[in-house]
């Protein structure tokens, strides 16, 4: 069987080594894949069993003898609503079912928010970022370079903010009906303040508020900073709420439910940072955000134009948590997003 798999794959297995005893494919860069060879008649059942977490199978009360020929019929026989494959994780999906049609898909994304340019630590100019956003079918772009406190990232002093505003105004005339929004990723300071004066913050179309400094803190300190930033009337989106970097850095401890409650109370959107090392907010809290009516923004935090494509990871992570199109900020079309921002300004 393994010889047949290897022969049919051909060059596609370049760099992979087959471990026949364990059934794993091991890549020279360290990736591991498990290959399960099954009879054609068992394929759908095995796909269901392998594609769901052990916890989901346990909560469903499922065993192989319960298989009814399809996943749809199997759920029906168990007397529960159908659960889409992306949500079979054993985390509230049986008690909080979501219709597949309402789940966010990548094709639902209309705009790309939270992006950096050569004004701070990005690799592409504002114009290059805009043109690529247009190329991949977006209706609008949010430029959110680093703010003045972020000296390590060439954060923007007020003079450079105003310079960028002028460039965006010119590009918006040239690229209409596509629109670039004037934003900033404003650092949340140690006391929870944002790092510009109110008269400057008020000139941005949108503000992503994020913590980048003094990450080694207690939950009480982290919550004080986050809640104060959420309550700031100029905050549009709370950026990467825990500051985690997967496989590299634990996030600072927070009470996710209190953060989401505060976002709901203050009309602040919650970022699902789509960078594969962040995926922050964690998908396990997305359903609570849906329950509380909080808008979630799937943001790439792009530092180059191709970083936009990280939104694919964000969409998949959001689906696991039941992220619905109707509560995804950047699934709004341009007119709807403009109205959303205008309402926030009142």
What are these regions (language model features)?
Residues 1-117, 123-143, 148-179, 190-346:
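Charged catalytic cores and adjacent phosphate/nucleic-acid-binding surfaces used
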Residues 182-184:
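Short loop/edge segments at beta-strand edges and connector loops
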């Amino acid at each position: 069987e393994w010889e047949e798999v290897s022969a049919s794959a051909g060059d596609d297995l370049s760099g992979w080594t087959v471990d026949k005893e364990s059934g794993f494919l091991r890549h020279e860069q360290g990736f591991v894949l498990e290959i399960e060879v099954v009879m054609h008649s068992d394929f759908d059942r095995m796909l269901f069993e392998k594609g769901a977490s052990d916890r989901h199978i346990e909560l469903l009360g499922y065993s192989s003898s319960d298989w009814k020929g399809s996943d749809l019929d199997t759920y029906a026989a168990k007397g529960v609503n159908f659960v889409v494959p992306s949500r079979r994780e054993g985390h509230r999906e049986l008690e909080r079912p979501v219709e597949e049609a309402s789940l966010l898909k990548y094709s639902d994304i209309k705009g790309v928010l939270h992006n950096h340019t050569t004004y701070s630590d990005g690799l592409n100019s504002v114009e290059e970022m805009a043109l690529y956003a247009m190329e991949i079918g977006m209706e609008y772009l949010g430029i959110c370079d680093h703010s003045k406190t972020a000296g390590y990232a060439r954060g923007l002093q007020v003079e450079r903010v105003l310079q960028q505003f002028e460039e965006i105004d010119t590009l918006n005339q040239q690229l209409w009906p596509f629109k670039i929004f004037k934003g900033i990723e404003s650092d949340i300071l140690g006391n929870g303040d944002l790092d510009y004066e109110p008269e400057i913050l008020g000139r941005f179309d949108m503000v992503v508020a994020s913590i980048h400094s003094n990450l080694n803190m207690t939950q009480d300190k982290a919550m004080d900073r986050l809640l104060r930033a959420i309550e700031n009337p100029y905050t549009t989106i709370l950026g990467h709420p825990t500051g985690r970097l997967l496989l590299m850095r634990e996030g600072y401890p927070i009470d996710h439910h209190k953060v989401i409650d505060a976002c709901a109370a203050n009309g602040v959107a919650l970022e699902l940072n789509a960078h594969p090392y962040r995926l922050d907010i964690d998908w396990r809290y997305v359903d609570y955000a849906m329950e509380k009516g909080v808008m979630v923004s799937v943001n790439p935090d792009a530092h180059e134009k191709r970083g936009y494509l990280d939104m694919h990871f964000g969409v998949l992570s959001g689906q696991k948590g039941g992220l619905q199109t109707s509560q995804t900020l950047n699934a709004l079309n341009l007119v709807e997003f403009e109205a959303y921002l205008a309402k926030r300004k009142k």
